[in-house]
């Protein structure tokens, strides 16, 4: 290697060959996936926070005086969301009362550790924390459920219970809005999955920045256009305290092929993530298509398009020792579909293994 | 070559749950120290540090999409990715975005 090449390699490594695209003063530390701009740490903080602020303002997510719960898992997305929302609330005088809301699924060695992280966040950010547990709400922990039914399908229970638990926790806190840390990568992934499942009801909902305005408590996704890479880099540079490990009962959940596909696309052309979200937003459902009607569960009063909500059906199965009740393909509103559509095994398996967490919009 | 390697975002679980590793990397036979790149380092890490599920870390000869790499706190996308030259005392951080939380 000649000295010229050596010098070039050094300067390339140090990023000294160019300056931050935005301030033109400092060394860049990051290549932004959505714009491909090379920017410094300080400008990164500024554009990251400002873009989220613009999303909040342009979509009118909040009104002054509202009580807002942040769904807090202790993971990177909710931790960064709690931090950034606190900052913006102060800086721009949104006038919000912010709370942390955590769900304890009762998974030993996983949720107890991540909840310790949220308890530290409560102190670090000065946000009151409410924890709601499956044990309190349903009488069953995930540990209990897995003992009964094994690893297959347990994610279905957890996803259904968690979604409802968040609403119940939000009601306890008497909040006006619930925010979650779903990011652009999560939403693009969900668009793909709902297309592949042919789930048109969810497809029309999954790109909405606010959902459930006709339900108990509206949910907002301020990170809808925020890339996961930037959330991780922000947390790293700010040294935010978060917990990351996969759920011990769904060790293969992260292998969902849609997630891997999204990451492969991002590597080739990072803008693809925003493009997929845009495609999801632009889908039009024929007005003649029958959509499930929202009503309430006869048993617990939660919103449901059936007589009983999914959580009550699953709970009845558990309590009766018949855990397979409610598991399997829904039959539609009237339950009159006889045809069992065969899916390729690998696709169905991958979809099933991803039936938890961010999928449950 | 003395390096500090850090694994985060769940990747530490692949390395005996150790987040920070101070390692002494031998240069490949006869290699000039100026020729040691991230490509060599990844190969070394896969061989010497990854104890389980290497597919969570590597895909082909590079990190799996969704794993972020910082060299001295700088995105490796700015410094040439696999061709980034690594020097003595460098700090290399790997963070996964694939694990849930």
Curated annotation (Swiss-Prot), chain B:
Function: Acts as a sulfur carrier required for 2-thiolation of mcm(5)S(2)U at tRNA wobble positions of cytosolic tRNA(Lys), tRNA(Glu) and tRNA(Gln). Serves as sulfur donor in tRNA 2-thiolation reaction by being thiocarboxylated (-COSH) at its C-terminus by MOCS3. The sulfur is then transferred to tRNA to form 2-thiolation of mcm(5)S(2)U. Also acts as a ubiquitin-like protein (UBL) that is covalently conjugated via an isopeptide bond to lysine residues of target proteins.
Pathway in which this enzyme or protein is active: tRNA modification; 5-methoxycarbonylmethyl-2-thiouridine-tRNA biosynthesis
Protein's GO biological process: protein urmylation; tRNA thio-modification; tRNA wobble uridine modification
PTM comment text: C-terminal thiocarboxylation occurs in 2 steps, it is first acyl-adenylated (-COAMP) via the hesA/moeB/thiF part of the MOCS3 homolog, then thiocarboxylated (-COSH) via the rhodanese domain of the MOCS3 homolog.
InterPro entries: Beta-grasp_dom_sf (IPR012675), Mopterin_synth/thiamin_S_b (IPR016155), Urm1 (IPR015221)
Species the sequence originates in: Arabidopsis thaliana
Compartmental location: Cytoplasm
Recorded family membership: Belongs to the URM1 family.
A Pfam family recorded for this sequence: Urm1
Cross-link (Glycyl lysine isopeptide (Gly-Lys) (interchain with K-? in acceptor proteins)): 101
CC terms in the record's Gene Ontology section: cytosol
Keywords (A to Z) from UniProt: Cytoplasm, Isopeptide bond, tRNA processing, Ubl conjugation pathway
Name of the molecule in the record: Ubiquitin-related modifier 1 homolog 1
Name of encoding gene: URM1-1
